[in-house]
Amino acid sequence: MKHLTEMVRQHKAGKTNGIYAVCSAHPLVLEAAIRYASANQTPLLIEATSNQVDQFGGYTGMTPADFRGFVCQLADSLNFPQDALILGGDHLGPNRWQNLPAAQAMANADDLIKSYVAAGFKKIHLDCSMSCQDDPIPLTDDIVAERAARLAKVAEETCLEHFGEADLEYVIGTEVPVPGGAHETLSELAVTTPDAARATLEAHRHAFEKQGLNAIWPRIIALVVQPGVEFDHTNVIDYQPAKATXLSQMXENYETLIFEAHSTDYQTPQSLRQLVIDHFAILKVGPALTFALREALFSLAAIEEELVPAKACSGLRQVLENVMLDRPEYWQSHYHGDGNARRLARGYSYSDRVRYYWPDSQIDDAFAHLVRNLADSPIPLPLISQYLPLQYVKVRSGELQPTPRELIINHIQDILAQYHTACEGQ
């Protein structure tokens, strides 16, 4: 399992390649990603965050072992080789337990790391940047690094115990955007300074030395930084290479290190490619994939309304709206404004808080009903042209079967294709 180390080596040798990380637990998104990687014969990096998946189940109800089992079962069913599958853990640290005293939060973080590593996750993002209940705000680089080193030691010991070798690849760094997109309207974003990036690296190197972990430094493959990309509900801050030049050049001084960029969702294909060229060679994508899923489902729901009598329709959109209103905890603190603004945000926001609701049984039943209604007879081509024009072109050329499921998968794969092209290298 050296796909990432090899990618970094090639990038450092001038290939300007990279890898994208699929950050989603939705079965259709994962199927789209696995099938796309299979067709293009590339490894696939799938990541779970500490919010989604933890030793207690996270918000998905899955432990790391459950998540691995779920992904591997899907990969097997699609004949995707498990040795081409890389599993990553994102923001692993005390993130979920910031309301607890630091000692308790870090004890939970130790167990979190053990559970991810024991389950076979090989890319580990150590993130101890968040202040706990009795911590100063913000934490110093030294405290953050000491906590990360403590977790790295736990990870190494767990890996040796379970697999007989220490082959983990680490990502460190703390200057990340708000996970899942910013809450507020944005206009401009500060790029991580080279000095801040160097300070993070040096603090971590020193802390790792104190833990006797010098030998793992070459396996610290990436530093999370902010290259100046972000999105809010209706806007995207596009990558501006000139603002990140000094940061980009800094990466060239490190033999085995590249940068990891979070919240790259909705960047243009040109910006994604330039990010990789500028050494932001691990691109995280999540909400953009579930946004594409939601687009396809809304389009199919509109087609259904044209074809099926109202009383027999799935009512997917209304079911979704009702469930989101009944259980507002995933969007209420994110979406602001009057009733209409919040209604639009629930359905269409780039931050895609609707992704938290797809597992709901009522919504899942409505989804299954929608697919059944549209699978009974062929969808008329003019309606595919009206509501899914990019897929229509592929249907007409014979590349794509016009079934509901294939239309959804292909629409998600249009986003994956942008990331694949950005990461291909020379």
Curated annotation (Swiss-Prot):
Secretion signal, residue range per the UniProt entry: none
GO cellular component: plasma membrane
Superkingdom as given in the UniProt entry: Bacteria
InterPro entries on file: Aldolase_TIM (IPR013785), GatZ/KbaZ-like (IPR012062), GatZ_KbaZ_carbometab (IPR050303), TagBP_ald_KbaZ (IPR023435)
Pathway the protein takes part in: Carbohydrate metabolism; D-tagatose 6-phosphate degradation; D-glyceraldehyde 3-phosphate and glycerone phosphate from D-tagatose 6-phosphate: step 2/2
Biological process, per Gene Ontology: carbohydrate metabolic process; D-tagatose 6-phosphate catabolic process; phosphoenolpyruvate-dependent sugar phosphotransferase system
PANTHER family referenced in this protein's UniProt entry, alphabetically: D-TAGATOSE-1,6-BISPHOSPHATE ALDOLASE SUBUNIT KBAZ, N-ACETYLGALACTOSAMINE PERMEASE II COMPONENT-RELATED
Family note: Belongs to the GatZ/KbaZ family. KbaZ subfamily.
Quaternary assembly: Forms a complex with KbaY.
Function: Component of the tagatose-1,6-bisphosphate aldolase KbaYZ that is required for full activity and stability of the Y subunit. Could have a chaperone-like function for the proper and stable folding of KbaY. When expressed alone, KbaZ does not show any aldolase activity.
Protein name: D-tagatose-1,6-bisphosphate aldolase subunit KbaZ
Organism this protein belongs to: Escherichia coli O6:H1 (strain CFT073 / ATCC 700928 / UPEC)
